[in-house]
């Protein structure tokens, strides 16, 4: 829907500049998301659950989820699919993106939603409210299921990085994938590389 006419492009031209993301920036952001996924989901969350710190575990779950959603949009190239939107619209946008043909990492949305359903029970020992949730949590503890989901997501991410030629490593701890992704960054600008 058109709100105003901009025949000369005075307003539209600068706005269009934001639709393009340089490849070096995209790769740098992918690397950063890999670092956050490793830190929040693979390293801190299991430690917080083991320690019994439900609030810290829930915070780690949130950070992992936000980084995973952002990474899915970055992998699918924001120029093609759009940027990850504001947090309250992220899952709706991720669901739409996941239903599109040829979407990379399309299964991440469903896995994240399952992880979030399990989070209350895993972090605070609060039983689920649905019969399906109660039945699904009796066999395997929710914390173990969340850790398995995280490892599955991370394995899928490594497979996608390999498919795109961004890594030659099999390592599923995502922090160790960062140097492989950053090898593809052409610019020497320090702001695009991890320490």
PLM feature segments, named:
Residues 2-195:
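Conserved nucleotidyltransferase catalytic core and NTase-mimicking acidic/glycine-rich helix/loop elements
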